[in-house]
Amino acid sequence: MLAFNFFGATEGGLFDINATLPLMAIQVVALTYILNSLFFKPVGKVVEKREKFVSNNIMEAKNKLSEVEKLEADLLSQLQSARSEAQKIVSDAENESDKLYKEALELANNEANASKEKARLEIENQTSSARDQLFKQADDLSELIVNRLILEK
């Protein structure tokens, strides 16, 4: 018996086949069922619910991000068009200002030329009038001299 015990297992060992093994199997199945119904299913539902919540939030965030990017692009295009419009308005205002400046300068030059021409004509008239008066006075004086010379002779 000693030789048999040396090679084999003793009674009540791990590999004894009796009612304990099926009872342990039933306990494992029952424990698995109880844990599944009381712990794993509710935890699984909570995990699924949380996963759904997270995926919905991620989807919403992606949608909002795409909407923000679209709005940003729209605002950038509006800003660009506003800048170009403002630049056009400034350019038009500068052109109008230059045009008004040139018109005012031309008008001032025309008025100055007209005044100059008027002054020249007035000076010419006065010169002509003075010359005529001098000629008349010279005629009168020469007539007076001639009359005195005639009277003295």
Swiss-Prot record:
The keyword Thylakoid applies. Signal peptide: none annotated. Keywords: ATP synthesis, CF(0), Hydrogen ion transport, Ion transport, Membrane, Thylakoid, Transmembrane, Transmembrane helix, Transport. It is found in: Cellular thylakoid membrane. Disulfide bonds: none annotated. Belongs to the ATPase B chain family. This is ATP synthase subunit b'. The gene is atpF2.
